[in-house]
Amino acid sequence: MTDQALKIKNLSVEYILKKGSKAAVKDISFQIKQGEIFGLVGESGSGKSTVVQALIRTLPPPAVITNGQVIINDVDILSLSADEVKKYRWKQISIVMQSALNALNPVMSVENQIKDVLEIHQNITGLDANNKVEELLELVDVSKENAKS
């Protein structure tokens, strides 16, 4: 294991639009060592949130990673399957978002995010997980229909 906690190499992200693609982040590279404090600073629209979403693989469509490597604790995140990265994210990565509106995964429903926590951290699956999700949603007065969107 190296002393690098995070290594981003030549990361590029594009938004694929009907009229073509638009580069959001182009060939960004940096590394963070274990115990190092790091800040990602830039103007609004400069790609900070896009970089963070890319490194934890939560980019909402139409954004796609078109190039690069994201290595966290010697694991190439971009080479993992969707299920593998989901488990890795839950066990190895913590992020504090600047805004509460960005705290949830933008590409998953609230229902599925709650279910993931139950499955990964409490080993509750299937019908038991579905019932627990409904119970938790009722506690905060969110309908299951709203939690699916």
Predicted segments — roles?
Residues 1-149:
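ABC transporter nucleotide-binding domains
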